[in-house]
């Protein structure tokens, strides 16, 4: 139970749990990962009804190989514990992960971890339900290293720059953009989250970009976070899916080159050589490690 499953997270598609129509469309999309939302996308008066719709959607829709996730309300609300209990009791066998919101400390994650442990025993579930945590408050970012290492159940951290803007007092008219800042206003926060995730062996994921009518700006944000080490990004609209899939997938020519270099190095290593020249490029153990972590492992995970 300590082994974390490897899941594609190039695109995490946000889907309101109150809409059967949108859940149907999400199940038919090309997204790697769909999270059915019980938090911001659902009005307080509709949250209990949305749980029922989510349970039905998880059980009846064909999700293919997608990661099926439910985003719950934060632990300061009266909804969070019932979100977990009702969804897991109703559709635990059809659920891969639960996304926690406004995570501040490791104790927040451990609360959900213990509750899920009890539910899994009660329901005799055959596999563990994973956790994903949104880091979207200053306190959460200050504690991000400890949060990332809080439990083996935790699979990824997501940078939620919308609420983080409010927490920091950052002027951000368009969530996910830099709004005139001379550079990337999110560079430090993203970099810090990625480092915490890599040290803990979990996935770093970038959050939303609100202006879904601007695919070029969305692509730029995807590329920025990908270069920093993020494995994927939220899509708040289906039109963003293809952009993110392309941005976070290794290019076919890069895969071919990486496999060529890996093969050449393996052959050289068998002959006792430590570094070789391939097409004018020095290849050694360090460069092979980079290729595996940035190209080859991703290609294997995505079936490329």
Predicted regions and their residues:
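Expand to "…catalyze enediolate/carbanion chemistry for C-C bond making/breaking, isomerization
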Residues: 1-304
């Amino acid at each position: 139970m300590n082994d974390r499953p490897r899941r594609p997270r190039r695109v995490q598609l946000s889907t309101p749990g109150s809409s059967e129509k949108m859940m149907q469309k999400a199940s038919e999309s090309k997204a790697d990962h769909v999270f059915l939302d019980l938090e911001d996308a659902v009005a307080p008066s509709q949250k209990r009804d949305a749980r029922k719709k989510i349970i039905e959607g998880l059980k009846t829709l064909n999700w293919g190989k997608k990661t099926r996730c439910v985003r719950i309300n934060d632990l300061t609300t009266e909804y969070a514990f019932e979100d977990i209990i009702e969804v897991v009791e109703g559709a635990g066998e059809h659920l891969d992960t639960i996304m926690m919101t406004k995570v501040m400390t490791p104790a927040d994650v451990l609360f959900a971890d213990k509750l899920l442990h009890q539910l899994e025993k009660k329901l005799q579930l055959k596999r563990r339900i994973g956790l994903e945590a949104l880091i979207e408050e200053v306190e959460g970012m200050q504690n991000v290293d400890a949060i990332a290492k809080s439990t083996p159940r935790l699979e990824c951290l997501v940078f939620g720059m919308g609420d983080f803007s409010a927490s920091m007092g950052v002027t951000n008219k368009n969530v996910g953009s830099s709004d005139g800042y001379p550079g990337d206003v999110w560079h430090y926060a993203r970099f810090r989250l990625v480092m915490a995730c890599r040290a803990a062996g979990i996935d770093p994921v970038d959050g939303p970009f609100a202006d879904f009518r601007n695919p070029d700006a969305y692509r730029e944000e995807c590329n920025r976070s990908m270069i920093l080490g993020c494995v994927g990004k939220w899509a708040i609209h289906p039109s963003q899916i293809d952009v993110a899939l392309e941005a976070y997938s290794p290019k076919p020519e890069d895969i071919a080159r990486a496999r060529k270099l890996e093969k050449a190095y393996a052959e050289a290593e068998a002959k006792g050589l430590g570094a070789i020249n391939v097409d004018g490029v020095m290849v050694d153990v360090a460069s092979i490690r980079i290729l595996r972590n940035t190209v080859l492992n991703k290609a294997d995970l995505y079936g490329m």
